[in-house]
Every structure is written in structure tokens, then in C-alpha cells.
């Protein structure tokens, strides 16, 4: 009859009622259809019900057991009303107070056998695996037995399991659910990261070795070491450019200790700069040694003899230790071409501890022939060291013959390059060879 009237008592979006009330509604409709079949099609037994019965959800109360049903109040008029072709006026329908003088509709028990035989209760939910719909929800409620206009949105829940699933060892998303009781619904659960129970580390735990291990690892990186060395060199270059006197103090130190067999700054400074450039840090000091040959050596053999004799004299006198690394510089002149004389410096590095001995020579600086002849004429024929050289040096002759020329650094006036630079170039080369021959130091 409700389908024919086309009247819906509740909008589709009405919240669900208690299951007892849902079961009572179709039973009441069936009972009214059986007892009041003579009524007009325009009159429905549900018209006299107040709207709040279906539009307002009732508070959830414990369902009443069917074993003790309360008295049922008929919702249709007495069957003794005479049949009529006209519609029954609305006043004939019982008032809301009379129709619901008993318990509320949500408390009505399911229909009895007579009513249940006419209309059976709808299923609790669609038979879809993986979805669970609570028994408290009726899909036909509020739609007069028709299919709902709005599709249902059942909640998804994992299959019920007993207990808590064990957390996996690997970091995987897991669905953890508790045992589900009958008729209960579960919201969608999201995966959570599970930590390995075997790993028990605090938030402030440092890696193995602590901060010192980290610093050691970074310092041991070749690329980082190269960057630090370049930065250090740049800073040192800036300091030494602003104050050249700071160079010996900045680069002095380390395990390399060298003695130069001379107290002349032109030799000591050149050797110090070269070895500190190659080794980074080096202690270089000067100690005057005797060559025991002529002041102006002539020839390669004489120059090498003078450099070696300076080292030996310091060792014999005890000025330096027998195992001390020493560097000796000795300049000499040689006739490399007919009537062509050149000034050359000989460098000797001797390391008794490692058994290393190296020789190197500076670039050759041309010397005019007349100045060499003057030095030869000033040397007596019976000079006892004539076998090794001349009594008067070429520098002394040039200093007397030319203005603004120093006997110790006349090379600058003739070539534009100082003697210190020439010694530095040769000393840097011999320092590089010396470093290659040293055994590797343990890290």
C-alpha cells in the first residue's frame, strides 16, 4: 500500500534505528494490510505516526528478548467499521498517543509468526567478502521496501583474527587488528612502520667511535685532506705575503730536522723554503762549516769536495750528530766551453739514518772572462790549495770592479735572478728526490 501511495516518510539520508524498531515496522505494515484491507488506497496506516519516529534517531537501548514480548497495540481501527466506498477520514485513525501508548517503536520485538509469514526481515547486508556491515543497519529502512537511492558505504575491515599479529622483522607495512566481536564494525586501519625489535638504539646514540671517529674518518679522506691543505696553503701565503718574516715560524715544526752547513742567510733561507714547500713542515737551521778547500773552487770535483767537506767538518767537531740530516751548498766556477766560464752551485743532501745521499746543481750563470782572469792573477802560484781553486773569489773581483754589486749576490746584476732563487730551485728538486726515497711513515 505504501508503494502505491508513493509517499516516503523518511529521506534517504536518515540515520539508522535500533534493530528492534526496524523489525517492528514491516510487521505493523503487514498487520494493517491484513485487518484494514477495506481502507482507501490514499490512506496509510503510517500517516498518523509522528514524523520524529523515523526522522529522529532514538537512543540506543538494550534490545528486548523475544521471550517476553510487551503487549502489542493495534495500529488499525476495529474491524466492525462498516464498509464504505469513501475514504476513512483521518480522525478515525488512532492518535499518536493511542498508537504509541506502549513502549517506543524502537523497543518493539520482531513480528510474531502471523506477521512474519507475510513479510520476512531483509538481510543484514550484501554478501560481499571482506566487508562487514553491522546488524544494526537496515538497507530498506526509510525506502518502503525499495532499493535505496543512495549507494551504501560499508566500512572495510580486515578478517577477524585472534590476538595481535607478530611484528615482522623487516620494515614492512602490516595490518594489525584485534579480534572482532559479532555485530561490531571496524574503521579502516592504515599501515604503520614496525621497527626491528633486535635493534635497540637511543635517539642520541652516536656511531661507532663517537665524534672522534667521525673526525678521523673525515680527516682521512684524501679529497678533504687536499682541500684542507690548499686552504692552509692559501692562508699561509697571505700571511707570509703581508709579513715575510712569519714564514719560518708558520712552517717550522714536524719530524724533519735539517742542518745547513752555513750561517749565510742566502743559503739557509733558500734551503728552508724549499724543504718546507715539499714537506709542509720542517725545522731548518744553519751551522757554519769549513770546506777546507780554496775559497773559489774550480771544477765540478772541487765543488763537490767542498760541499762534502763542510758536512764532515761539522760531524768531526761534534756540532751536529752523526745521524743528523745535513744539506751543504758550495759554489764553484767551471770552463764548460772554450774561454766560457760559468758559476754553478752544488747541493749535497746526506741522511745517514736512511742511507740516502743526493747531489744536485744549480743553473749555470755566465761569468765574463776578464773577471776570471783577474781572480787567477790575484792567486799566488805557490798557493797550497791551488789544486782545488783560487785564493780570490769571482764575487770579490766583481764587487771591486762594478758599482752596486755585492760579492755574495752578484748573480742578480748579471741575470736578473738572485742567487737565493737559484739555490731554492735546486734545493726544491733535491728535496723532492729525498722525499721519494724516504720510507712511508705509518699513519
From Swiss-Prot:
<comment type="function">
    <text>May act as a regulator of the protein kinase A (PKA) during embryonic development.</text>
</comment>
<dbReference type="GO" id="GO:0005794">
    <property type="term" value="C:Golgi apparatus"/>
</dbReference>
<feature type="modified residue" description="Phosphoserine">
    <location>
        <position position="406"/>
    </location>
</feature>
<dbReference type="InterPro" id="IPR026533">
    <property type="entry name" value="NTPase/PRRC1"/>
</dbReference>
<feature type="compositionally biased region" description="Low complexity">
    <location>
        <begin position="109"/>
        <end position="134"/>
    </location>
</feature>
<protein>
    <recommendedName>
        <fullName>Protein PRRC1</fullName>
    </recommendedName>
</protein>
<feature type="region of interest" description="Disordered">
    <location>
        <begin position="1"/>
        <end position="165"/>
    </location>
</feature>
<keyword id="KW-0597">Phosphoprotein</keyword>
<comment type="subunit">
    <text>Interacts with PRKAR1A; resulting in PKA activation.</text>
</comment>
<dbReference type="InterPro" id="IPR026534">
    <property type="entry name" value="PRRC1"/>
</dbReference>
<feature type="compositionally biased region" description="Polar residues">
    <location>
        <begin position="29"/>
        <end position="45"/>
    </location>
</feature>
<dbReference type="Pfam" id="PF01931">
    <property type="entry name" value="NTPase_I-T"/>
</dbReference>
<feature type="compositionally biased region" description="Low complexity">
    <location>
        <begin position="81"/>
        <end position="96"/>
    </location>
</feature>
<comment type="similarity">
    <text>Belongs to the PRRC1 family.</text>
</comment>
<feature type="compositionally biased region" description="Pro residues">
    <location>
        <begin position="59"/>
        <end position="72"/>
    </location>
</feature>
<dbReference type="GO" id="GO:0005737">
    <property type="term" value="C:cytoplasm"/>
</dbReference>
<dbReference type="InterPro" id="IPR029001">
    <property type="entry name" value="ITPase-like_fam"/>
</dbReference>
<dbReference type="GO" id="GO:0042802">
    <property type="term" value="F:identical protein binding"/>
</dbReference>
<keyword id="KW-0333">Golgi apparatus</keyword>
<keyword id="KW-0963">Cytoplasm</keyword>
